[in-house]
């Protein structure tokens, strides 16, 4: 709605409010409307009055209130309703609801306020500035609006220029010099087509957004200048603008420069003042062209000779060209020369002073004014990087840390080219910009200034070129070369493009190949630099990641070890450590067990370690026999038992150490006892010969007594499975199948009782000696002892003897076992001879497998038995290393061993239970029947009911003889033993 329309409703609203306050109830037409009682402040304006409806409504100006749309209209109901109900309904529906009168009034008020603000700030309000200033469109983000702004500005410029004469232009320039802050100056600048706004961003946006418009404007200006024949006027006007620049620091100097440059460029391009070479030079030197173009080509050459003239003229347009370069992308020569001149001005006040003096020669007043103006605006440019700066500007005045340097483009490795002024600075990335700019300036100023000539001595082309038109051509060539060298920079690339387009590329083409080479070299160097800098960035990223993620400060080089550390402790490394000690499992096991136990009953300790639950009950004598000569055999036995039975393995955790230790000391004693028992039983000597080194004395005795069933099949198979592992495997299997074997062996051992009798005596002695050690090592060696005794116990079925031997857990006596075999040998052999042969074959296979697995795992864990026992054995039987890790799991697993041994015993008892029951019951309870043929040690220990071999062996034999009662007895006995072990 228009402001007038808004004003009308406001005035009318007041009247309506008064009317409403007086008349709470009013009629719209004939219908009565009941309105709630309200105060004037609360009531919204109601313009709906009978008067308004009487007169015809002008819908162009009619308002909602006039039509009767009021807050009450939304709540209207029948007249019968009360005001309270109306109020409630109104509360529910209208207040705050879209379309409610309150909301509408608010929206209307806000819209009015905004309209007022826009009217005040709108570009239309600023009519004087609207004509030629694109600043009016600063709020406009559309390119079309900016283009139109530029067009309008250029049109105004054309009109002013056509109307103004050169004298008027000069007068305008003087007035600008006197006071540039005045609106006239601003309008003139705006007319020139450049925004009055001094911010580099706005200038850049305006210039970049409408390059075509700007070009068209410059062309129009050039046309006007040519038509008016006031090229000199324009040239003068441009310096006038330049002189005005020092006065107006606030005014956008680059804009003025751009205007002057644009005029000069258009003049030079359109006017045939000079040949193409000089024209190109002038095109490159927009300031010079106005200066020289106004007079003649000779004037241009003089301008080039006296760099002060181009410096001054170009100093202002050089900055202009900077903006124009980014916008119009003028030929590279213009950029290079103007850049050089501007670089001279930027390089320092002394440089500017010299050019100012030279300019004084040409135009003292104008140039003097221009030089300070150039200094100030250039400083501005140095400060403000918003504009697109030419590479020359960067080379001249900007520090090395300019944005271009960040990309690495300004950096130019100084390569082979020493002829071109830029080549030598190219070697030094940061020095190049300064040298290049100075050289370019020197090219322009060389002849007049000796210091510049000295600086440009490195640039032979510039120094060699004599001052004059030739200098202009040489300067143009040098500028072309410079542009080619400046490629890394964006402006330099633009230059090159412009140079190629202009066609002034004679020297450029000649030097194009070396430039390409240099560019390639530079690129390679830049790549190298970037590659060298990349690792630093990566390092920064590393540190940043560390800080960000909050992870521990670990270098990437540590990632591999870190991964290993982060990984959960693999089970493989645990067995690996025991594997390292595979060579020394005996020593480790002996260390695990007490030295006394090892010395006395090393082998018995092994047997006890495995036989802790069951073997201790019955296989005390067998334990002495079970420990084998070879410590590896004891380890294998322990490992076999552990693999066969998890509880036994836990027991074997202790056992393997003790068993290996016992194997060292008692292995020899057992070997002797085995040899004795082997000597006594000729049929068993076969088994003993194999078993003495490999199997424990129990097997030897059993073999001697049961040479055929156990000796040949079982013990030999055990030999095949592993000599060292035979006894443990037999014991493990004996816990299950060796019970049957022992029962059968007891049958076979019955005839061999006489043979085992002698070893019984020797074994009994050993068991007596070893009993103490076995008692000490009951905790450590129960597993290994349980292995050997397990087999022996299978042979010896008397549960009573198993219990007695329990107390003498490790007092394994081959003699006692042999006595067991002798005493129980006949019944055991009679009962379990046949079954034992069958079981021995099965057990041999099982024993072989178990022996292989147990040997590996047990040898691995032998070194670190204590540390890894518990977890490992619980999870994997093969990975016994974990079980060996900690001795505590061995104790925990002892009850398991008891249970398993008892179960195995019960299993073994099931087959030979009747046989061994008769044997064990017939014979003394301590000495289990020599049922376990391979466990002749158990037989020997059976002679000595105290001895520990009867633990597993006796339990097995008890199971064999009396399957259920011995099992029950064995389980409690195993429990008691386990209690004793800890």
From Swiss-Prot:
Start-end of Basic and acidic residues biased regions: 669-685
Secretion signal, residue range per the UniProt entry: none
Region (Disordered) residue spans: 75-97, 192-216, 274-315, 400-473, 489-545, 568-638, 651-716, 910-982
Q: Where is the composition biased (Low complexity)?
A: 931-942
Name the coiled-coil region(s): none
Residues annotated as domain PP1-binding: 379-436
Q: List the Pfam families hit by this protein, alphabetically.
A: PP1_bind (PF15276)
Report if keyword Transcription regulation is assigned. no
Any one GO cellular component localisation term in the record: cytosol
What's the domain of life for this entry? Eukaryota
Gene Ontology biological process terms in this record: cell division; chromosome segregation
Q: Where are the transmembrane segments?
A: none
Q: Which residues lie in Basic residues bias regions?
A: 518-545
As for PTM, the annotation reads: Phosphorylated by CDK1. May regulate its subcellular location.
Residues the record lists as Phosphoserine modifications: 100, 122, 133, 286, 296, 306, 390, 397, 424, 572, 595, 735, 913, 950, 973
Location in the cell: Nucleus
Extract the InterPro entries matched here.
Answer: PP1-bd
Q: Please provide the record's keywords in A-Z order.
A: Cell cycle, Cell division, Isopeptide bond, Mitosis, Nucleus, Phosphoprotein, Ubl conjugation
Glycyl lysine isopeptide (Lys-Gly) (interchain with G-Cter in SUMO2) crosslink: positions? 741
| Modified residue annotations for Phosphothreonine | 309, 402
Q: Which GO terms describe its molecular function?
A: protein phosphatase regulator activity
Residue ranges, compositional bias (Polar residues): 75-87, 207-216, 275-315, 451-473, 498-512, 651-668, 952-964
The entry describes its oligomerization and partners as: Interacts with PPP1CC.
- Its job: Regulator of chromosome structure during mitosis required for condensin-depleted chromosomes to retain their compact architecture through anaphase. Acts by mediating the recruitment of phopsphatase PP1-gamma subunit (PPP1CC) to chromatin at anaphase and into the following interphase. At anaphase onset, its association with chromatin targets a pool of PPP1CC to dephosphorylate substrates.
- Please state what the protein is called: Cell division cycle-associated protein 2
